[in-house]
From Swiss-Prot:
Name listed for the protein in its UniProt record: A-kinase anchor protein 3
Effect seen on changing residue 131 to P: Abolishes interaction with ROPN1
Location of Phosphoserine modifications: 205, 208, 403, 635-636
Illness: Spermatogenic failure 82: An autosomal recessive male infertility disorder characterized by asthenoteratozoospermia and multiple morphologic abnormalities of the sperm flagella.
GO MF annotation, one: protein kinase A binding
């Protein structure tokens, strides 16, 4: 959108809004700017993890249904439990998870159940569950110890079941306790009080309570030994005791009327049995579990390598543990280093000669380093200021590089290094701009059309000269005067060169006709100038006269007698008509026509010859030509050139002194003329429908026209096919312009699907009001750009649903972009007025627009 848009008065209709839902086989190619803030990155990762978990649950379990898994051992029918998992992610946020575990008692099939071959498996699973609980308890003990610094603390964990409400917990707590709760419940159901084979494990179902609450307690005791010597530190020995507490459901509640009411709770604590558990799990296993948990936490934090500022519980715990360990290790290291240094250098520091020698050495090294630094700085300053001058485009790009570096430095943790990094990034950007090779320019519409015009024109003239050479022959060619036009040999090919501005004239002796060649520069100028003036003629006449009539009128134009003389070696001189070639005489000598156009253009052109080595193209003449095309002009033909008068088509052009043009036109002039042709062609293609609307249906008989968003009157600017060679060149040029402009008309090329516009906003810390305003402005901008449907992805505030309803209502009512923006401004004024008075706005932006739009 290069042109200015009056948003408040825009009459474009609003587009529809939909939720983006990619297919199963559709790849998502997201392109977005990632933030350098670690808090946002961690938040995004956590949200992605929650979404992935929800998708996995949706695949395995259907919404609203439960998954019950019953496991029972054929050898031991007493054990059996089922896990019911209710998927409620589609109804609420991922934090609202319901996890329920039930216990089923399978009655005995015989009077006594034998363990048989399954006793060994039960024993292994029993101790594995106990060991897992121990590792988890040890990890929690160490984390709490590192945070609070308490040595004697009891880690208490309980799992509530049944009809008791689950306490409100965050998702991170639920994730961290999920494994422990599951293992605890399994060990409770699988192993009631003792290990298998202990004598009282195998009993009837009446001996074990039907509903139990499981609690695990970790106690730490310290025992201090007596000191053996005066310098010995008091050694401390920690003993770990692990026991399980069972609570009977029948003892806690009394059943009254089919409901459970809480009563005085009684806890049944079993005595510590060192022969049962603590004797089987040795002290080495507990120490190993403790070291494994510590190493695991350290390795996780080393892998992450981030600075955590989030309030997540797990990250805070790990950070504090690491900080405390690091402080202790660094403190011990510094103390030992200083003690060793003092013991070694204690005697040397008292020696004055040694101290003076050390000072001299340090001073000499420091002076040398300072000298090197100053030399480097001065050399850099000299190179920047005197040796290598920075080009103009690099100086313009320097501000952009500095602003980019400043933006990229936001979010850095250490503010002290900000200036250093900023200078390094700016210097790197500047060096890349200075020493990098210039990028190749993209193929623009002007370059494409200019190449096409010159190539077609050179091919046309080559064919014409081949016919002349065959009919006349070189033996009849005579050079009568210095102004006689030279003719090329039949074996010369005028293929279009790669660089238009660097066309050069090969040396040739004028006395040998077989070595004669046309100057490619002049032929390029002839063709471009002819196309330029023909297009200007169409602009002036509004397409009401044929291009051939203008060619014939220009061929009989009388020029003033006081024109400056032309150098004899110029290859675009006027040639006398060839006698004997009746066909060429009937069609007029186009070379003389081109020459006349050039001579006239030297006095009237749209470009000024500046004194700078690189002339710049002004934009004002283009605007004048645009106005000339937009308003309907008089249909009377322009006056022919008489004396010093200029034609009506060139009346608004800028004067240029003829003395500034020498005999041979430079490549820069060729480039300027080519740009003028292109700008006028673009003007015609965009805005020639104002004065040609009446001719749109009369002369539109060409069936080969392409259907596009352009009006039919555009083709009235095109001359009829086959009316002349110059008209054929213009026909091809207009067609190239038309094809080029199709890409910007809003319609995709044939065979290509329309692009899909998807908006994904990630404003985690922004308010709901700002998010709604951002979504509305994105919708309005897409409507102004004629986007059919705007898709939104990644919404958690309910904005999508409201915006869908608003867009559907606006489309039904036929609202425009200007009406929507005016409504938004009214809402903002009301909201600011309410805030100034102290009132609260009752409705949000989307709700207010639904009511008042």
């Amino acid at each position: 959108m290069s042109e200015k848009v009056d948003w408040l008065q825009s009459q474009n209709g609003v587009c529809k809004v939909d939720v983006y839902s990619p297919g199963d086989n559709q790849a998502q190619d997201w392109k977005m700017d990632t933030s350098t803030d670690p808090v946002r990155v961690l938040s995004w990762l956590r949200r992605d993890l929650e979404k992935s978990t929800a998708e996995f649950q949706d695949v395995r379990f259907k919404p609203g249904e439960s998954f019950g898994g019953e496991t029972s051992n054929s050898g031991d029918p007493h054990k059996g439990f089922s896990v019911d998992y209710y998927n409620t992610t589609t109804k609420g946020t991922p934090e609202r998870l319901h996890f329920e575990m039930t216990h089923k008692e399978i009655p005995c099939q015989g009077p006594r159940a034998q363990l048989g071959n399954g006793s060994s498996v039960d024993e292994v699973s029993f101790y594995a569950n106990r060991l897992t609980n121990l590792v988890i308890a040890m990890a929690r003990k160490e984390i709490n110890e590192k945070i609070d610094g308490s040595e004697n603390k009891c880690v208490y964990q309980s799992l509530y079941m049944g009809n008791e409400p689950t306490p409100t917990k965050s998702l991170s707590k639920i994730a961290s306790e999920l494994v422990n709760e599951t293992v605890s419940a399994c060990s409770r159901n699988a192993a009631p009080d003792k290990a298998p084979g202990s004598g009282d494990r195998v009993s009837g179902s009446s001996q074990s309570p039907p509903n139990l609450k499981y609690k695990s307690t970790l106690k730490i005791k310290e025992s201090t030994k007596e000191r053996q010597g005066p310098d010995d530190k008091p050694p401390s020995k920690k003993s770990f005791f692990y026991k399980e507490v069972f609570e009977s459901r029948n003892g806690d509640y009394a059943r009254e009327g089919g409901r459970f009411f809480p009563r005085e709770r009684k806890r049944f604590r079993g005595q510590e049995r060192p022969d049962d558990f603590t004797a089987s799990v040795s002290e080495g296993i507990m120490t190993y579990a403790n070291s494994v948990v510590s190493d695991m936490m350290v390795s996780i934090m080393k892998t992450l390598k981030i600075q955590v500022k989030d309030t997540t519980i797990a990250t805070i715990l790990l950070k504090k543990v690491l900080l405390k360990h690091a402080k202790e290790v660094v403190s011990d290291l510094i103390d030992s280093f200083l003690r060793n240094l003092h013991s070694v250098t204690g005697t040397l520091m008292t020696d004055t000669q040694f101290v003076s020698a050390v000072k001299r050495t340090v001073f000499s090294h420091g002076s040398q380093k300072a000298t090197d630094i100053m030399d480097a700085m001065l050399r850099k300053l000299y190179n920047v200021m005197f040796a290598k001058k920075v080009p103009e485009h690099v100086r313009k790009a320097q501000d952009k590089a500095e602003s980019y570096s400043l933006i990229s430095m936001k979010g850095m943790g250490d503010p002290k290094n900000r200036n250093v990094n900023f200078a390094m990034k700016s210097e790197t950007k500047l060096r890349e701009k200075m020493y990098s090779e210039p990028k190749s320019e993209e193929e623009t519409c002007a370059k494409t059309l200019g190449e096409h015009i010159i190539k077609e024109g050179l091919t046309l003239w080559h064919k014409t000269q081949q016919k002349e050479c065959k009919s006349l022959g070189f033996q009849h060619a005579a050079f009568e005067a210095p102004n006689t036009q030279r003719k090329p040999a039949s074996d010369i090919s005028f293929e279009y060169p790669e660089d238009i501005g660097n066309l050069s004239l090969p040396p040739y002796p004028p006395e040998k006709p077989e070595n004669f060649m046309y100057d490619s520069d002049s032929w390029a100028e002839d063709l471009i100038v002819s196309a330029l003036l023909l297009i200007q003629y169409h602009l002036a006449q509004g397409g009401r006269r044929d291009a051939r009539s203008f060619v014939e009128a220009a061929g009989t134009t009388n020029f003033p007698a006081n024109e400056p003389p032309v150098a004899p070696d110029e290859s675009c001189l006027k040639s006398a008509p060839i006698v004997g070639d009746q066909e060429q005489a009937e069609k007029k000598d186009l070379r003389s026509v081109f020459f006349n156009f050039i001579r006239n253009l030297l006095s009237e052109t749209i470009f000024k010859r500046d004194q700078s080595p690189e002339p710049k193209v002004p934009e004002q003449p283009v605007k004048e030509d645009r106005k000339l095309c937009e308003r309907p002009l008089a249909s009377s033909p322009p006056r022919l050139y008489e004396d010093d008068e200029t034609p009506g088509a060139l009346s608004g052009l800028t004067k240029m002194a003829v003395s500034q043009i020498d005999g041979h036109m430079s490549g820069q002039m060729v480039e300027h003329l080519m740009n003028s042709v292109m700008k006028l062609c673009v003007i015609i293609a965009k805005s020639c429908d104002a004065s040609l609307a009446e001719l749109g249906d009369d002369k539109s008989g060409d069936a080969s026209r392409l259907t596009s968003a352009f009006p039919d009157s555009l083709y009235e600017c095109l001359p009829a096919k086959g009316t002349g060679s110059a008209e054929a060149v213009l026909q091809n040029a207009y067609q190239a312009i038309h094809n080029e402009m199709r890409g910007t008309s809003g319609q995709p090329p044939e065979g290509c699907a329309a692009p899909t516009v998807i908006v994904s906003n990630h404003n985690l810390t922004d308010t709901v009001q700002n998010k709604q305003l951002q979504a509305v402005l994105q919708w309005v901008a897409a409507s102004e750009l004629n986007v059919p449907i705007l898709y939104f992805a990644g919404d958690d505030e309910g904005i999508q649903e409201k915006l869908l309803q608003l867009s559907a209502a606006a489309v039904d009512k036929g609202c425009s972009v200007g009406e929507v923006l005016q409504s938004v401004l009214r809402y903002e004024k009301e909201r600011q007025l309410n805030e100034a008075v102290g009132n609260v706005t009752p409705l949000q932006l989307l709700d207010w627009l639904m009511v008042n739009l």
